[in-house]
């Protein structure tokens, strides 16, 4: 079974990845204006996120505008929104569950097997949360690539990957790896290791009585 150090490492990785997912969901830099071809814009930079689009001037001032209509958004953007929100909610739930089952905490009672199962459940929830975020970021990234190579879209309104999508990929990987380490807390190994089959020794010949 995984020791408390391995559990703590997995929880720390998953927590760090979840914080990254929160950051990438909130910031608007999922797409950034492309400078490919003749599209050379030095006066301003345009960004698009899950909730708003922003324009940054050369002076450093940024102005953002929230999306007015949900129905006017693309299906990929709406799906990415939903998956990221689900990922964050599952990650928060996984943190609570994993904390109850970790060896270094007093929550969840003193039953080691029960705590190991709780920690393993938290790790599985972390993995599901990371996969949801990974699918969301990959789907959104695929849409960016598709639009970039679409000849019907003018060059001056094409976008490239923004920093947020890379943060999302990195955060997803950390959450999945951290959840995998927590899932190594399999209670079966410990229960088998804690029980030893008693050995039977043959009786010594000296104990026999001779007439």
Swiss-Prot record:
Induction pattern: By androgens.
Cellular-component GO terms for this entry: apicolateral plasma membrane; basolateral plasma membrane; bicellular tight junction; lateral plasma membrane; plasma membrane
Tagged with keyword Ribonucleoprotein: no
PROSITE patterns assigned: CLAUDIN
Topological domains annotated Extracellular: 29-81, 139-160
Positions in the Cytoplasmic compartment: 1-7, 103-117, 182-211
Tissue: Expressed in kidney, lung and prostate. Isoform 1 seems to be predominant, except in some normal prostate samples, where isoform 2 is the major form. Down-regulated in breast cancers, including ductal carcinoma in situ (DCIS), lobular carcinoma in situ (LCIS) and invasive ductal carcinoma (IDC) (at protein level), as well as in several cancer cell lines. Loss of expression correlates with histological grade, occurring predominantly in high-grade lesions.
Family membership: Belongs to the claudin family.
PANTHER family for this protein: CLAUDIN
Protein name: Claudin-7
Name of the gene encoding the protein in the UniProt record: CLDN7
């Amino acid at each position: 079974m995984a020791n408390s150090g391995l559990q703590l490492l997995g929880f720390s990785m998953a927590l760090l990845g979840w914080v990254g997912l929160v950051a990438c969901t909130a910031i608007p830099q999922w797409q950034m204006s492309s400078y490919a071809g003749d599209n050379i814009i030095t006066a301003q930079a345009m960004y698009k996120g899950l909730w708003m689009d922003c324009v940054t001037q050369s002076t450093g001032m940024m102005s953002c505008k929230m999306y007015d209509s949900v129905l006017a958004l693309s299906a990929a953007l709406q799906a990415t929104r939903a998956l990221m929100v689900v990922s964050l909610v599952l990650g928060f739930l996984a943190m609570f569950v994993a904390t109850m089952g970790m060896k270094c905490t007093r929550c969840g009672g003193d039953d080691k097997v029960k705590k190991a199962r709780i920690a393993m459940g938290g790790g599985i929830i972390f993995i599901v949360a990371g996969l949801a975020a990974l699918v969301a970021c990959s789907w959104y990234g695929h849409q960016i690539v598709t639009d970039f190579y679409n000849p019907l879209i003018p060059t001056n309104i094409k976008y490239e990957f923004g920093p947020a999508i890379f943060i999302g990929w990195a955060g997803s990987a950390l959450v999945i790896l951290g959840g995998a380490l927590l899932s190594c807390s399999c209670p079966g190994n410990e229960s088998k290791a804690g029980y030893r089959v008693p050995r039977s020794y043959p009786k010594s010949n000296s104990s026999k009585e001779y007439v």
